[in-house]
Regions:
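Phosphate- and other anionic-substrate recognition elements at nucleic-acid/protein interfaces
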Residues: 1-156
């Protein structure tokens, strides 16, 4: 099963693609989509780039991190922009007839690291270990790969 994980952001969106077979993982690709310009330009870039990745790799499922707002630091403007980025990703998956699944950040961390409030460095380290990578991926790409790994653990 090919799984595309996506860590949404209006400025940086991470993506990571793995192939999973009976909890054996094969790393295929990962990276970060860096956007510039107005909000509509950034959202369009996310949609176009995710759509190109879907069309190139033909994943069976797209995994996206569920949005949340920290109660100790509410930022409605950031949440709305994140919602726009998520909408672009969901639209790209839908327009290419891909199954889309969501996991909470804590669920992803608990599955990959073993604790729901793991630090980004711990997630990156475990992604590197599980995928047998020579070096740790960029933080946003590592989060996306962690989402893909999480789905593999939950569905295989």
């Amino acid at each position: 099963m090919k799984i595309l994980g996506v860590d949404p952001g209006s400025r940086i969106t991470g993506f990571g693609l793995i192939e999973a077979n009976k909890l054996k993982f094969n790393y295929l690709s990962s990276g970060c989509i860096r956007t510039q310009g107005t909000l509509p330009e950034r959202i369009t870039t996310i949609f176009v780039e995710i759509e190109q990745i879907i069309q190139k790799y033909q994943p069976d499922v797209v995994v996206i991190e569920r949005a949340f707002m920290r109660p100790d630091r509410p930022n409605p403007d950031a949440a709305i922009k994140l919602g726009h980025a998520r909408g672009a990703i969901i639209s790209a998956a839908g327009s290419n007839h891909r199954l889309m699944v969501e996991y909470s950040p804590n669920q992803i961390k608990k599955t990959v690291v073993g604790k729901g409030h793991a630090a980004k460095e711990q997630v990156s380290f475990m992604v590197q270990e599980l995928l047998k990578l020579n070096k740790a991926p960029q933080a946003d790409a590592a989060d996306a790969l962690a989402g893909a790994i999480c789905h593999a653990y939950h569905c295989l």
